[in-house]
Amino acid sequence: MGVKGLNQLIKEHSPGAFKEFQLKNLFGRKVAIDASMCLYQFLIAVRQSDGQQLTNESGETTSHLSGMFYRTIRMVENNIKPVYVFDGKPPVLKGGELEKRLLKREEAQKQIDSIKDTGTVAEVMKFEKRLVRVSREQNDEAKKLLELMGIPYVNAPCEAEAQCAELARTGKVFAAASEDMDTLCYEPPYLLRHLTFAEARKMPINQITYSEAIAGLEMTKPQFIDMCILLGCDYCETIKGVGPVTAYKLIKEHGSLEKIIEHINSNPTSKYKVPENWPYDEARQLFMDPEVTKGEEVTLKWKEPDVEGLIQYMVREKGFSEDRIRSGAEKLKKGLKTGVQGRLDGFFSVVAKPGAKAGDKKGDKKRGSDSKASNNKKKRK
């Protein structure tokens, strides 16, 4: 679900935390991708001309495999090394959110049943997309495909976003990639959004720098997490009537959820009501100390694709075109053989000229572009 209104709050208070660029700008990077989110996107977006999901002759859905295969190849062709992270068991606190999603799917099915004879294709499609969920079988199929492609994946013990952030924090990869803004609660150095969107959508990739985001908000990590809980997360309900502006204001004024609750409960005229038995502290702990496999225990290895294995699985078992799969496999093979080439910003640093004086405008002017490059220098992953 993500965190409601967080993107806009960061844009307002920390505009410098945002960057937009094209896929090619991630040249030479390793990225941990929320696989469950990707598969969900592929099941919604990868469709036939009539709006229906891709299927083979047996009627099996193959949209997720098509999306995973071709989007991964596009990244590898741009000299990016992806690693996919799959969800493990959901936290107990997430049960309420999962139940809400189930009810929404049931309601969507009722809407489809009521309009399927009289509704337009667009109306039916709108509700059909609400029925989409990633099955365990589809997860397993995606893992098998990745193995054949030579692309590593990680089975998270719990939340995939938390594991992506752990890999980024410990230097295994450059960034975590997910559409869920709550990924920022796990403190990845960088969050990438829109990474696996279709090229036809022409959506630039969004990069959010965590350190700049909380610096602009002037918050500590615990305060940032408390604000996200107030905004609304997957783990618990929020205080009714508290929107982004109010949530930010309350955290700035009181500093923590405990103080906010104390303020509301001690003010009889307050229009806000704290939910009964509100598990905000348990939610906070899930963000502060998530269940993850430590980065140093994870080994990531990109291997040469098994071309004939891909033909057997994707063509003979799943009904894809052999010419297209062979062509894609060759692109993948070439891209992975190239390896991650070093980025220029990983090799150069600026050294002041001997005898240069601080505040020397002439020297500063000459070094302007180099200084900017130095400030933007990032450790190569």
Curated annotation (Swiss-Prot):
Positions of region (Disordered): 354-381
Record field: compositional bias (Basic and acidic residues): 358-370
Region (I-domain): 123-254
Any one GO biological process: base-excision repair
Subcellular location: Nucleus, Nucleolus; Nucleus, Nucleoplasm; Mitochondrion
EC number per UniProt: 3.1.-.-
Cofactor note: Binds 2 magnesium ions per subunit. They probably participate in the reaction catalyzed by the enzyme. May bind an additional third magnesium ion after substrate binding.
Top EC class for this record: hydrolase
Region entry N-domain, spans: 1-105
Protein keywords: DNA damage, DNA repair, DNA replication, Endonuclease, Exonuclease, Hydrolase, Magnesium, Metal-binding, Mitochondrion, Nuclease, Nucleus, Phosphoprotein
Sites where the protein binds DNA: 47, 71, 159, 232, 234
SUPFAM superfamilies documented for this protein: 5' to 3' exonuclease, C-terminal subdomain (SSF47807), PIN domain-like (SSF88723)
Region feature (Interaction with PCNA): 340-348
GO cellular component, one term: nucleolus
Cofactors, names only: Mg(2+)
Listed InterPro entries: 5-3_exonuclease_C_sf, Flap_endonuc, HhH2, PIN-like_dom_sf, XPG-I_dom, XPG/Rad2, XPG_CS, XPG_DNA_repair_N
Modifications after synthesis and translation: Phosphorylated. Phosphorylation upon DNA damage induces relocalization to the nuclear plasma.
Residues bound to Mg(2+) 1: 34, 87, 159, 161
GO MF annotations, alphabetized: 5'-3' exonuclease activity; 5'-flap endonuclease activity; DNA binding; magnesium ion binding
Binding site for Mg(2+) 2: 180, 182, 234
Subunit structure: Interacts with PCNA. Three molecules of FEN1 bind to one PCNA trimer with each molecule binding to one PCNA monomer. PCNA stimulates the nuclease activity without altering cleavage specificity.
Protein's job: Structure-specific nuclease with 5'-flap endonuclease and 5'-3' exonuclease activities involved in DNA replication and repair. During DNA replication, cleaves the 5'-overhanging flap structure that is generated by displacement synthesis when DNA polymerase encounters the 5'-end of a downstream Okazaki fragment. It enters the flap from the 5'-end and then tracks to cleave the flap base, leaving a nick for ligation. Also involved in the long patch base excision repair (LP-BER) pathway, by cleaving within the apurinic/apyrimidinic (AP) site-terminated flap.
Family: Belongs to the XPG/RAD2 endonuclease family. FEN1 subfamily.
Name this polypeptide is given: Flap endonuclease 1
Gene name linked to the record: FEN1
